[in-house]
Amino acid sequence: QSNVGIPDADDSNIGGKTQIVGSKIFVYYPGDLNEFRTQIRKGIAEVLVGQMLFGDNWREMIKNNALISFPTWFTKGLTNYAAQPWDVDIDDRLRDLIGRDKYSNFNRLKGDNVEIAGQSVWYYIAETYGSNVIPNILYMSRVTRSIESGFLFVLGISLETLMKDAQEYFEFRYETDEYGAQEFVDFDPIRTKRSADYSEPKVSDDGRYLTYASNQMSKTKVFIYDYVKNKRKRYLRQGHKLDRLNDQSYPIMDWNPVTGELHVITEKKGKLWMTRIDPEKGKVSKIELLRLEKVMEMDFSPDGKQILFSAINKGQSDIYLYSIAANSQKQLTNDIYDDRYPAFWKGNSILFASNRANDTVNLANNYLEFAPLESKDIYQLDLNDDEVAFNLTQTPTYDEKSPAAYNDEKYIYLGDESGIRNRYIGRIDSSILSIDTAITYRYFSKNEPLTAYFRNLREFDFNRNEKKIAELFLLDGRFKFMSKEGNEVVDEYVP
């Protein structure tokens, strides 16, 4: 049994979800300031929307709630829009709904799909009529006790016409995006459930295995797929299917390139555990990770002796270098910025994504002078000189994440510059800055897109030794895996 997610339980919460009790909101820092900010905005918006529709005292609430019932897409869609009007992830989920012809009837949608469809309607209204009409729609809906009348009096069109107009708007938009887009190659023959979410695709060092995690109503499973035998096997299972808020932050996984073992990080009763799994023998051992509150990403060193963690401790997300032999970690960054997706690169340098506004990695007490940015760039940090990080992408209006080393000169990562998350490649170059008693060089990076899919590339994992990549997409209502090898990994798509 569990009381997590029950509205009356105001003493617990899951990251990424906002609990509302009366006029109180309960939020939890998920390791990303943008997500945290969205939680706060959504909580405030839900309180304000509730007061606008039902009144701000209990008598009005009881009276109005008995006289009118607002559909989920109307209320939840509006609070989601107020918290985050639009982003590439919402766009991708809506693109999938419209592609499956599920958008025309909101009453048949369930779960998050209802909220996404509702949010798209409010987004369309704001883009077409202006966001100033939204409070008027709420007021007229409350006064007339009818959402149909609210839209008709303010917009001058019926709700049915509004729905058709919104659908045509997005259909035209997505048809334009698909023109000239890169087609998918054959997907891996891995069965996935429509009712489950999938994450953490990781290719083993020898290129034979692909591991991934499934999450169905908080019941998580870890699978290992054998490319050679075309078979998969479940190795870990945790949790139970419960109708509650779904925590999708675990498990976190990566392969040890030397031993060939899979390391899986899970959370149980407030403690972090790292389990070693041999694909042939099964579970080997389990140890507790100390002095960390939450681990979000991990990456093994080439010698298999160290692990990079992006982890939360004392309310901030930083990069840690973990020693397997000593079961202890060294903190590499210490500031208010979100430092995510660490990866080993050439020599003693690492890659990571961050929303930092300053290249100094130890600004523990400077909370106001250098405010975090709303998007992340890819950074390089030399472990021998770990005071300054070098910005590799420098795109303040676009978001990048999940860097991975391609070789000693190049790196690949995910970016949303086109409005759809695709894979990019970058390399560091140099030019002569001045010639005096010695030549001074200026270092910079060059970045260009590798893929042009019309759907978000949600996650990927690259095997540097075998030049093999596994990609994860949401297509036709279910998650699908696609693997590539050799030159296909870095061949630039030209329409």
Residue spans for each PLM region:
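Beta/coil-rich, acidic/histidine-enriched accessory regions frequently appended to metallopeptidases
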Residues: 143-244, 248-253, 259-261, 279
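Blade-edge beta-strand/turn elements of extracellular beta-propeller
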Residues: 182-189, 327-332, 386-395, 443-448
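A flexible loop/linker signature enriched in serine peptidases of the S9 family
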Residues: 92, 96, 194-195, 213-223, ...
